[in-house]
């Protein structure tokens, strides 16, 4: 009986994910801000059903009911998040809120399957992040000097990245983090926010050629520090964010063309300068030729995705740990192996719907400063997803030093 439940749940999980994904795109039929109470209640229900079936599978297959206890805490968190945020901020974008909760729940489920201890740590980080995120909209509405400290954002960003370059720990050949009190920090993630505030502050009311050049020089300083740190994935994300925010601010296609040409030239230069970039390109071109060394990681990722087929092998029934660093940049391959390619495609579409909603929200914002920030968040968000999933599926070469899609 237990085996029947486990086997049938694979198909129900895929079915509920398809319904949830369809509901995301259904909301695009209506203007931003229009309430779709029935649709969002349906999404909440589907989110709950997907989480229940996933954690039930983990408990039944492993025989360990700690997964159900963990699910109870996740459920409390998701319910509290949706309820509290909706009550405090009545005009919250429910599609983005629901998508965030869905992706968080799935992420915690998969991480708990790979490493329960890491899942607990991630859960604590998510709780702390929720507290801060509840304050951000209030602060943005009450404090009005954010537009006036443009150069402070740039100074802090460059200082943080330089600190990591000088004092950071070397992880797989890249300097990307440092530890403080046993907790590891990756400042480039925080600097992304400062970087977008800097770009918006520099360009929201002045888009002259001189201002664009000055902004490009300072943005280039961020990128160069990341390149010297060998954090090429983050450098690429910062560069793409800069190019598209400048385009959004100026509506000048020449800047976009210049950015694309410059990006191509920088990619060629990186190929010539960094040995590990050449290794990654070789592994991308023919991973099967180097399956025992350079191509091992990507071939294992492709094996995992292929073995999952449409509906997956079932949670705890695959072998995702055969992929080095699977819990980091190859988690999508793990998801496809055990939950199926249909589930994986739905995840991608949910991310795409989030990006499209961010763009729709940006169009509706009248304050140019915040509009550019939202544009930038959307671009950097979708490009980071493109790098991670594209690297793990052999759509693009991996950009990490050793075994990381983008470090």
Where are these regions (language model features)?
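Hydrophobic alpha-helical transmembrane segments of multi-pass inner membrane proteins, especially
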Residues: 64-293, 333, 337-339, 343-391
């Amino acid at each position: 009986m237990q085996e029947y439940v486990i086997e049938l749940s694979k198909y129900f999980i895929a079915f509920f994910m398809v319904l949830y994904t369809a509901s995301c795109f259904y909301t695009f039929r209506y203007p931003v801000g229009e309430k779709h109470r029935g649709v969002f209640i349906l999404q909440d229900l589907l989110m709950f059903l997907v989480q229940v079936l996933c954690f039930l599978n983990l408990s039944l297959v492993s025989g360990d009911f700690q997964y159900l206890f963990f699910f109870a805490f996740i459920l409390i968190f998701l319910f509290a998040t949706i309820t509290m945020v909706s009550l405090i901020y009545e005009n919250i974008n429910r599609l983005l809120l629901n998508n965030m909760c869905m992706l968080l729940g799935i992420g915690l489920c998969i991480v708990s399957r790979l490493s329960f201890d890491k899942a607990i740590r991630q859960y604590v980080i998510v709780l702390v992040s929720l507290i801060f995120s509840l304050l951000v909209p209030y602060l943005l509405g009450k404090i009005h000097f954010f537009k006036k400290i443009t150069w402070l954002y740039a100074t802090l960003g460059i200082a943080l990245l330089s600190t990591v370059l000088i004092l950071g720990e070397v992880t797989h050949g890249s300097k990307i983090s440092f530890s403080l009190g046993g907790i590891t920090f990756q400042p480039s993630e925080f600097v992304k926010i400062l970087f977008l505030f800097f770009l918006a502050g520099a360009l929201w009311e002045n888009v002259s050629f001189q201002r664009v050049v000055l902004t490009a020089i300072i943005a280039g300083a961020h990128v160069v520090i990341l390149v010297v740190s060998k954090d090429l994935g983050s450098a690429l994300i910062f560069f793409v964010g800069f190019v598209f925010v400048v385009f959004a601010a100026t509506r000048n296609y020449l800047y976009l063309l210049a950015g694309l040409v410059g990006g191509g030239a920088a990619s060629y230069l990186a190929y010539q300068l960094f040995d590990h970039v050449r290794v990654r390109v070789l592994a991308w071109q023919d991973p099967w030729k180097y399956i025992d060394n350079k191509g091992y990681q990507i071939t294992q990722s492709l094996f995992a995705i292929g073995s999952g087929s449409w509906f997956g092998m079932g949670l705890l029934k695959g072998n995702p740990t055969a992929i080095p660093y699977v819990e980091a940049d190859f988690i999508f391959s793990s998801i496809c192996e055990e939950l199926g390619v249909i589930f994986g495609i739905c995840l991608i579409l949910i991310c795409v719907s989030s990006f499209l909603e961010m763009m729709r929200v940006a169009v509706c914002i009248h304050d140019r400063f915040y509009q550019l920030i939202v544009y930038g968040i959307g671009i950097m968000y979708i490009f980071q997803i493109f790098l991670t999933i594209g690297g793990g599926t052999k759509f693009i070469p991996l950009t990490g030093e050793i075994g990381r899609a983008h470090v």
